């Protein structure tokens, strides 16, 4: 990415201004705009959620709702920069000891105050083996003191380096200086959770009537596979500047159905992926309602690195080379995506990546090299490699899986069997490692290369490629020992090169965020590359 240093300085300036001025993020209704009498919003969320417990979730659909229900120390502003949430301000000593100063008017939906101890309880719960959080290793990326030993079962959760100095002061001690630590705290897994409700209701604490939240909204209704309805929380500290009273999330997996219900007036915002076959038609017919924006995500095929024959780097490399990204991007997807050559998008803040040699080859040369590698591994036209390709229910993922299977067959003679699973089962299968190759997409939790790279560490709970590389782990450990930004950037490049050398995944393309938004939905900008969209920032214009 060009101009990284300048962008980082600008982001730092925005952050400093937010902290100094204690800016409250909420719906900003321009002068002269007449609001609709009925302030309700209907959004498609793409699938039924895995859970509403911030420590039990790992996907985008769950995070979309969690941002409305729970508020962490920090939130994202409209441009994707970290901004004050429950924490009004924060400071640090040598990027190792961080102190967060909490709002005194932050409350739970039951009216009780949100305190620093709530964050201590939440973070300890997130790393507790009994919680079995898929994001258990997330705080490890921030290198909080004691986290490694806790996750290894060598220390109790009470040894985690987080403590409440008083009700409104939280101190976090890291084992290593991490200058970008504050960026991690926008993620839902770092939100506070209600101890009393969890202890009273157990696994059912997230049900309507039981749940207690501290965000701008609380849960009104949840009909599995039909809808989740949230209503405005009168106890939210900035409720006076919240406009939308109710938001409904629908679990529609089909992009075509999503668009059809949008055009019939049932939905105000579609999910962030539009049907391939309808995209150009929609751009022509309703151009002002089509929003295509940068999105910090990578679409890839995840190879089970531990399962034979995929534990052979020659097989993995052949699959990587045999994927024709130009056809996927230009003929199948055709929505402005960039072909991917690595895991971390090149436009990530703090990244300065170099394209691998193979990316400059023609597809014919890639295919030729892939066939040689397969032959070396024992696979020929008479004895072809056969793989199962797993994808979760979605029109888009199905079309891409069909295209990928066709390309691998045509280009390098690999036979592919397609396997479809619903979202929750799909996630479990990947974690359990009972698959060959799976459709995957990783969207950054914060705008920094480690949000991608850390998920490939051998001990990461998000490493569903089951990739184990001491060399990669060593490079990532080195990033914590340098304070110079240029040196750290060079190490990120080296880490990406190691992933490419090992062909840990098959990168396909870098996402764009493509969705339909009704003209009467105000406050949606699409400028946040993390797509951290908060309902509290939006409003409905009279129409």
Curated annotation (Swiss-Prot):
Gene Ontology BP annotations: chaperone-mediated protein folding; oligopeptide import across plasma membrane; oligopeptide transport; peptide transport; protein transport; response to heat
Signal sequence segment: 1-26
Source species, domain of life: Bacteria
Disulphide bridges: 297-443
Subcellular location: Periplasm
Family under the similarity heading: Belongs to the bacterial solute-binding protein 5 family.
Role noted for this protein: Part of the ABC transporter complex OppABCDF involved in the uptake of oligopeptides. Plays an important nutritional role. Binds peptides containing from two to five amino acid residues. Displays a preference for tripeptides and tetrapeptides over dipeptides and pentapeptides, for peptides composed of L-amino acids and for positively charged peptides. Cannot bind the cell wall peptide L-Ala-D-Gly-gamma-meso-diaminopimelic acid.
The name this protein goes by in its record: Periplasmic oligopeptide-binding protein OppA
Source organism of the structure: Escherichia coli (strain K12)
